[in-house]
Amino acid sequence: MFNKKDKAEEEISEVAFEDLEPTELSAAYHKPSNVRIIMDSCADFAPGIAEQLGVDIIQFPYVGPDGEHYDDGWKSISAHEFFEGMRKDKKLRYTTSAITPGHYLEVFERAAKQGTPTVYLCFTSALSSSFYAAEQAADMVREKYPDFEIYVVDNGAPSSAAQLLGLEAVHQANKGLSAKEIAEWADDAKNYIHGYLTLETLDALAAGGRIPAAAANIGGKLDVKPELTYDSTGALTVKTVCRGRKKALKSLIQDFRDSYSHDTSLPVGIISADSQKDANWLEAQIRKEKGCEGLTIIHSQVGPVIGDHVGPGMVAIVFWGTDRREKLSLSDRIANRVRKSN
């Protein structure tokens, strides 16, 4: 994959996330007039992007040692403060919860009164019950406002993968797709977005009960770094295990090579949990790929809701690629069709 003498491994930018230049999107990415698009804070938008797109963001709640908070895109607390606290206290964890039907009802009713056909691209149902709460609220709004169009779509993608879906949904709305068509488009398009991530430690997985504490302890001593991806439902799964951080980062780049669509008109996302140095390294490697020199790469920080489950040091790459459904077994493909027909 990489020549041992490749100097690229040494050419790592030290620029902090806060000092990165804001992402400049083309004029195609602006607030559409024909469709209102709503998303939630678990899409982990880069600073200023949601505002440029005109996307409304519903904030997820979480509870820390000092009480309840809302994921406001790191305005109330910096990502560094949040994750540094987890580094210093390995037992520190936050309680996360779904968005309630009542909160959704308030947001959707406000949209109904304004009248613009609305699409809500909701955080994957594989990781949160919020999707079902949103559907319940949408049904209540449809009953009260029968002429109002509202569609709830399970985005099937955690974190910044959803940001890519939102970006292109806005683009397609500006190209003339209706709200109904955007919902149908998003439900299909989400299957072409890939996401791969690696963790700095296994502590967060152990604290969340996903692996035994003993396994995390042994894994730490062996310098084991898991690489995760998400399946067709949006649930995180372990793809492989690497020995050492550098091998894990190289594995992310190899996955990019294997699955990237090579459509350079579509942006790539890199997201981290207070691990910008490694995020910068990933960008440098992507730009070395043929045709990717001028690619739009959007850097984001994972929010507190997902961040609590992956821990500090997580770094991920998300991009448009091949149809992920092609990798499903025949049985799983049939199961997906059954789910959609019900």
Model region roles, listed by residue range:
Residues 39, 122-124, 153-154, 318-320:
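Short beta-strand segments
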Residues 2, 36-100:
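N-terminal glycine-rich anion-binding loop in soluble enzyme alpha/beta folds
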Residues 88-127, 132-136, 183:
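Glycine-rich phosphate- or other oxyanion-binding loops that anchor nucleotides, phosphorylated ligands
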Residues 87-89, 115-120, 142-153, 299:
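Glycine/charged-rich beta-loop-alpha catalytic/anionic-binding loops adjacent to active sites
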Residues 1-10:
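N-terminal acidic, proline/glycine-rich, low-complexity intrinsically disordered segments
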Residues 35, 116-120, 266-268:
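Generic beta-sheet signal
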Residues 14-32, 42-50, 56, 61-63, ...:
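Mixed-charge interfacial surface used for oligomerization/domain docking
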